[in-house]
Amino acid sequence: MKGQETRGFQSEVKQLLHLMIHSLYSNKEIFLRELISNASDAADKLRFRSLSNPDLYEGDGELRVRVSFDKDKRTLTISDNGVGMTRDEVIDHLGTIAKSGTKSFLESLGSDQAKDSQLIGQFGVGFYSAFIVADKVTVRTRAAGEKPENGVFWESAGEGEYTVADITKEDRGTEITLHLREGEDEFLDDWRVRSIISKYSDHIALPVEIEKCEEKDGETVISWEKINKAQALWTRNKSEITDEEYKEFYKHIAHDFNDPLTWSHNRVEGKQEYTSLLYIPSQAPWDMWNRDHKHGLKLYVQRVFIMDDAEQFMPNYLRFVRGLIDSSDLSLNVSREILQDSTVTRNLRNALTKRVLQMLEKLAKDDAEKYQTFWQQFGLVLKEGPAEDFANQEAIAKLLRFASTHTDSSAQTVSLEDYVSRMKEGQEKIYYITADSYAAAKSSPHLELLRKKGIEVLLLSDRIDEWMMNYLTEFDGKPFQSVSKVDESLEKLADEVDESAKEAEKALTPFIDRVKALLGERVKDVRLTHRLTDTPAIVSTDADEMSTQMAKLFAAAGQKVPEVKYIFELNPDHVLVKRAADTEDEAKFSEWVELLLDQALLAERGTLEDPNLFIRRMNQLLVS
């Protein structure tokens, strides 16, 4: 063949093929769903390009997918008259995987086949799924608008390499022929193929036809029979659509192997006319935190496909939402740039955002277990919401979940509504603490008094939490209060000090002055506190001071971190504080104060600038 060359697969493709053939074999029929789905996408792309260039139809505007098989040759063929591919596109799409981060993702997969099948399915198996049942795959394609002699041939046994060549192909589109492996004869059975198409592809908006051979007057007459409904699912009445159809449609548009958690299908008429079908996945995409991660909705205008991944219709903190919007108010020649600056887009975005938040609120109310699955997968993303979307902040806050001292578990299951319902009489604020880990938050000395008083504290240990709490200032009219910041309401919780205790504290004034003189500018202030029950000392920050966790975030991002000036608070009832106060020798007094400060800093920050000095100092005091 002209222009024939043999090329090696990108290493990631080889890995994917190996994993997929072994992990997805138990559900091997999905290859047909994937190939028909790709053919449908090719038809969508042709329709879109034809808006500006009708000649691409080449006089054939009846788009369809055809499935045929040859029992003698043991081949199954899926063909379409969609947009087709050029030689360069064939090499790009069938020889490589363009997604960044693919290599590390594939390397992270283990030998657990159940887990692998979920993850690989979520990855979007697409064209390569053909190799689950075929030991050789042949592709013949020609791009719309190209001359017949610019057709392309591609063939591979799915091992290490593939062959590509130039051919003549009269009709545009793509034809994929699967040379079935031994033992895969079920895919040469007419009834079996029909049932798979009905199961997985009934929602495809263009006809899926199967070859029908009949004997008439001694001759074999070939015709094509439509198997699916061939009506865009979102245009049908909700009452006519089964849950199974909604799930299969999700798998088609999201290229996901798993069922969605929930969905919402709505048709809006009036000032704005649009139909939306929005899904919440059950599992986060493997590349969700990758900056190149594609997200957004499929955009249709008057049922004509316009683009994938239209990000403009959903805020970033809802980037996990999949689905589509079909608008009657946008023009067919709309571009991403026009969408960016469109009043229609902004109105649609606001409406769809509210719709998703309502969908999540309903899920949380109706099925707490499913909502917990959602939170485990997407909670970190939703936590970006309070900073991004002030208008919907209260609705987002209702959806947040936290660990707390009430549950004694690291699971984030407590809602703010739960917390408020359990607030003590006279309690005006919602108390929380941020730390590097759940264990550090739970054991913080800042919690001692609150625990004694039976007051619940939210335990926040995700990196995003401190940043989120800078924007989330109140809920249900009640302000949030970090227990690691100095606050009058925390001091008010302490038991009232009797006269004799007040006299004893007065006697400690010279001690406090000595500590201030020793530490100088290293701390903002030194004072006595009644917030502690078991701990000798803590460090706190003023309300207007940067918190410890925020300083860590700045440092991790490579930003210049302003020095955090702590308030050093001492427990007058603790034996170590009394011992330090009674020490007259200045050198030993200095050692005691430095040790107490280091302990407080270690509890607050988790690290010390000079841990060896801390250990030496502690050892000296232990033997003295």
UniProtKB/Swiss-Prot annotation:
What lineage does UniProt assign to this protein's organism? Bacteria, Pseudomonadati, Pseudomonadota, Gammaproteobacteria, Enterobacterales
Give disulfide pairs as residue numbers: none
- State the family it belongs to: Belongs to the heat shock protein 90 family.
Gene source species? Shigella dysenteriae serotype 1 (strain Sd197)
> What binding partners and quaternary form does the record give?
Homodimer.
Q: Where is this region: A?
A: 1-336
What's the protein called, per UniProt? Chaperone protein HtpG
Looking up SMART domains in the UniProt record yields: HATPase_c
Region entry B: which residue ranges?
337-552
Keyword list (alphabetical) reads:
ATP-binding, Chaperone, Cytoplasm, Nucleotide-binding, Stress response
SUPFAM superfamilies attached to this UniProt entry: ATPase domain of HSP90 chaperone/DNA topoisomerase II/histidine kinase, HSP90 C-terminal domain, Ribosomal protein S5 domain 2-like
